[in-house]
C-alpha cells in the first residue's frame, strides 16, 4: 500500500527469488508525491516476467487516472525510463470511489475501501484475511476535525465491518496547537486519532505520517502522551513489523 521512499527496500520481500516471476498488487491511497516517490526506484519494474497491478480509487483521481499519473511520473523530464519501456507488465486499475459490498479479493485477502477527507481526495483501505480473522485499516492522510459526517460514517463502517479491525494505522501528524494553525492541510492531531480509534472500535492504533519538522525526541514525547491516553497505541517506526496476532516488534 503506497509507494513512499522506502519502497525499493521492500522489493526483496515482495519477490524473494529474482529468477522467478512475481505478481504484485500495489494500492495507492492518493497521488501526492510523498506517496509515489519510491515507485520509480522499485527494481521489480525493470524485471521481465514481473506483473504489477497498480490500483487507486476514483476518489483520488482529481489529477487523472492511474495510468495518466504513472505516465507522468515515469518519463521525461522526471525519469529517464519511459512508462512504455518498462520490462515489467504494469496493469493500471481505476477502482470505484468506495468498495461497498464488493471487496477486491487477492491471495486469500479481501480488500475494501472508502474515501478520506484530504485535499485532492484520499482513500482508506481495509485488508481482511478471512482464514485467520485478522484485519487492518490504513488511513494515511485525513483531516477528521472538519470531515463531512457522511464520510466519517462510511469510514466508521469500514473499520467495524465485517468485524472491528485489529489494527488502525492512521494519520496523527500534528499536536493540538499545530493542527489548529494548519486547518485545511488535510491532517489530524494525535489526540483526535486516539479518539477516532476508540469510536471505531479498533483493537490497536498505530500513528503514521509524522510531521517532517518533528525530531525523534518530539515523537517519543508524543508517543508517551498518546499511550497515557490510549495504552494500545504507538507511533509507527521505519522497519517495524507487526504480527496481528501479537504486539508490535521493533
Predicted regions and their residues:
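Binuclear metal-dependent hydrolase catalytic cores
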Residues: 1-137, 145-146, 220-250
Amino acid at each position: 500500500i503506497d509507494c513512499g521512499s522506502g519502497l525499493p527496500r521492500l522489493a526483496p520481500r515482495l519477490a524473494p527469488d529474482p529468477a522467478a516471476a512475481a505478481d504484485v498488487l500495489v494500492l495507492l491511497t492518493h497521488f501526492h508525491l510523498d506517496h509515489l516517490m519510491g515507485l520509480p526506484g522499485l527494481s521489480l519494474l525493470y524485471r521481465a516476467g514481473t506483473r504489477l497491478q497498480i490500483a487507486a480509487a476514483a476518489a483520488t483521481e482529481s489529477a487523472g487516472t492511474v495510468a495518466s499519473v504513472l505516465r507522468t511520473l515515469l518519463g521525461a523530464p522526471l525519469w529517464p525510463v519511459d512508462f512504455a519501456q518498462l520490462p515489467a507488465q504494469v496493469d493500471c486499475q481505476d477502482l470505484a470511489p468506495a468498495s461497498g459490498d464488493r471487496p477486491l479479493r487477492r491471495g486469500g485477502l479481501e480488500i475494501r475501501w472508502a474515501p478520506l477527507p484530504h485535499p485532492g481526495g484520499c482513500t482508506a483501505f481495509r485488508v481482511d484475511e478471512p482464514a485467520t480473522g485478522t484485519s487492518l485499516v490504513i488511513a494515511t492522510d485525513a483531516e477528521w476535525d472538519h470531515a463531512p459526517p457522511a464520510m466519517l460514517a462510511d469510514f466508521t463502517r469500514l473499520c467495524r465491518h465485517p468485524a472491528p479491525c485489529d489494527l488502525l494505522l492512521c494519520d496523527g501528524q500534528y499536536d493540538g496547537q499545530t493542527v489548529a494553525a494548519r486547518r485545511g492541510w488535510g491532517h489530524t492531531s494525535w489526540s483526535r486519532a486516539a479518539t477516532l480509534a476508540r469510536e471505531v472500535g479498533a483493537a490497536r492504533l498505530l500513528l503514521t505520517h509524522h510531521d517532517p519538522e518533528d525530531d525523534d525526541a518530539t515523537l517519543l514525547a508524543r508517543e508517551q502522551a498518546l499511550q497515557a491516553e490510549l495504552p494500545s497505541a504507538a507511533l509507527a517506526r521505519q522497519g517495524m513489523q507487526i504480527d496481528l496476532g501479537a504486539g508490535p516488534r521493533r
